[in-house]
Structures are given as structure tokens and as C-alpha cells.
Amino acid sequence: MKNKKHVNWWKELIRFLFVVYICMVVAVTLFPLPIGFPSSAENLNRSVNFIPFASIFKDIGQIGSAYDGDVLFMIGLIVRNVGGNVLLLIPLGFLAPIIWDTYKKIKNTILLGFTISVSIELLQLIESLFSGSARITDIDDVICNVLGSIVGYFIYKITLKLAATFNMQVVDKTNSKDIKCIDKS
């Protein structure tokens, strides 16, 4: 008899979605790689912000004056920037606890979100240093990204609670042989 392995398609689907998600994060945050001359110190100074909320408040302060006074355009830019940075790591906060037991604790998920976000910002800084790109390294992005991972984690917990309330089976663990139904922690 042939040795047949059972494939759990839900686990494989979640893992596949996670890989696709990581590829999309890399594509959105690091590509295209610009080819150009290294940035001058002056340009680099303008593309780094280590003061929390400084760029967000600066953008808010420019509503009505930047872009020829186009208020809606400026508000749209702020919403896209802040909202996009929050949305970026929501899937990480949702999927990490499903794939790895370590991230079932919120502090570990927050640390993962922080580590991923700081890594992205450092890679963008290196990109700016060596290619002359217009990428900005901003602590506000890190704050919004970490907030996104927290939101994703709470969506994960709410999903488990709703599934338990309605007696539904959910994929809660992809690193074991069997699907574990409902995490009651």
C-alpha cells in the first residue's frame, strides 16, 4: 500500500495567504527599487522623522494651505497615509496567532508587529542612503503599523469568540496534525 498523507487544505490555504501577504508587504513598502545617485545629507534629513506624530501633525497643519488649498485632497492624503499604515499589519496580527502558538499572547504579536515595522523602516532608510530614493523613514509609520497588528490580533480574538458563540469550527492552529477547534483562552 502507498503511504498517503492527509492534506489539510484549510491549513495550507492560511499558510499560502500568509506568504502572499508577506510578498505584498514587501512589494508595497520596498519596491520598486530606485536606481539613482545617493541622497545628499540635506535630503536624508528631510526623509527621516524620529519624533512621534510630528509628520501627522505637520500634515494636519497644512490642510488648507498645501496643494493650492485643496482641503479634501490633503485630508485624503492623511487618511491614506495613516490608514494605509494601520491596515498594512492587520493581517499579520490576525494570521500570526493562527500559524504560530507564540503569537497567541498579545505582547508577542505587538513585538512581532514592532520588529517587522522597524525592519521595513530601516530597509527604507538604507534604500534612501544608497539609491537617492524619496522613501521616508518615519516613527509615525511604526506607531501606525503596530496599532494595525494590535487591531488584527483583536479581530482574531473576536473571530474566535464569535465562532464559539455560534458553535462554529475555525482553523486556530496550522502547525499541528489536526485542526484545533476554537481557542478558548
Language model segments and positions:
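Bulky hydrophobic segments
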Residues: 1-134, 150-185
